[in-house]
Amino acid sequence: MDEYGYVYGYLPATEGMEDVTPLGLIAHLDTAPDFNGQNVKPQIIQGYNGEDVVLGTSGRVLAVKDFPRLKGYKGRTLITTDGTSLLGADDKAGIAEILTAVEDLMREKTPHGKICIAFTP
């Protein structure tokens, strides 16, 4: 960790993968001060139809034209906010996913290039 609160490190490339382009993974450490994680209102969409996602009655919409990757989740279950609160994970979920991915790579001995990791304040 540096004097500004940035945490960074790397997982070295496995043997024979040293020339592969490094992969960078980044997440922020802080949480949104405007939302305290109470009164979280998730919206669970079973069998997503591949169209725009209306976030409850908030007037907010996740439009497929703005988020074209949504179409790839057609038929799956989506969990979103109802538009009035954060889901409570903020980027703590991002940190957990990055650390889990690195742990999995180390445990399973999956061949990989250098993995660069950074967590920002």
Give the positions of each predicted feature.
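Beta-rich nucleic-acid/ligand-interaction surfaces
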Residues: 6-11, 114-115, 119-121
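A non-catalytic alpha/beta surface segment that caps or lines the substrate-entry region
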Residues: 1-20, 30
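Active-site metal-coordination/substrate-binding segment of hydrolases
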Residues: 18-109, 114, 119
